[in-house]
Amino acid sequence: MRKIFVFMFLLIIPLACIPFSQQESFDDKAGTQVAIALTANALDATVSALENTIEPTVDDQPDIQPTDSPPFDPTQELGDPAYTDDSSSWTSWNVDPGDQILESVTTISVSDGKLSMQSSQVGKFHWWLNYREIDNAYLEAIFETGNCAGNDEYGLVFRSPDYFNGVGYYFTLTCDGKFDLREKTDPNSLIQDNQLRFGMQTSSLINSGPNQKNTLGVWMNGETIRLYINNQFLDEITDAKLKSQGHFGLFIYAKKTPGFKISLDQISYWTINN
């Protein structure tokens, strides 16, 4: 028995001296890669770097679907308007030339061929609607401001189901050159800042200050609403909560200037046929 044990011991010693090949270090082969992901929509395209991700192969990349790009100026594609009000009419607004209609602190009137609203006090929001209703359409209006300052607001109302509860969309400009889209869906709610979809963005396309003219345009088609200023695209939403036809008109919100006045020189709409 002792002899067998010695023999096995002598056999193990040389085997222990035989080198085994070592695995190559994973850390020596691994590297850091950066993948670039591109996202795009009808408004703009942004590029962001995503660190510590594996670069996708061609087979892994999703198919890019074409988008419906906003037209530069919708009126160039839609032809003649279906409806226009200007200095020769204003018969669809329940106000006649020479009238002075007082609603709370706001006076609505027609003079010098323009439909005007003027607020004698600050802090009052007032709208005035056309009796017509439109569905999918492009709506455009030429506004002129009087004396104003800062965050005095004015603009277009659309998709308003009735005259009284204020439900609808409000394409808003301020005297100091900001824009937004107010979405008021609750008839029992007051006008609030949390109804604003864009957070009051500044735009160089807006002619800011008193005694200025701006052309406001709204493309409304189902859940898509696009905003235009002076015939150039501003921004859009694609999840509009109010999608049914409704009245349209103008509004004024004197937040800084007593006596703030706006005038509507012309308003037109074009029907969008899907």
Language model feature labels by segment:
Residues 237-265:
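Flexible glycan-contacting loops in extracellular carbohydrate-active proteins
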Residues 17-84:
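Ser/Thr-rich, Proline-interspersed low-complexity disordered segments
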Residues 87, 265-269:
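Extracellular beta-strand elements of beta-rich domains used
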Residues 87, 139-141, 207-227:
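Short tryptophan-centered beta-strand motifs in secreted/extracellular beta-sheet-rich domains
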Residues 189-217:
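Short, aromatic/His-centered strand-loop micro-motif at the edge of beta-sheets
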Residues 119-190:
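Secretory/extracellular carbohydrate-interaction modules
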Residues 81-105:
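Short, tryptophan-glycine- and acidic/Ser/Thr-enriched carbohydrate-recognition patches
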Residues 104-125, 251:
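Short carbohydrate-recognition loop motifs
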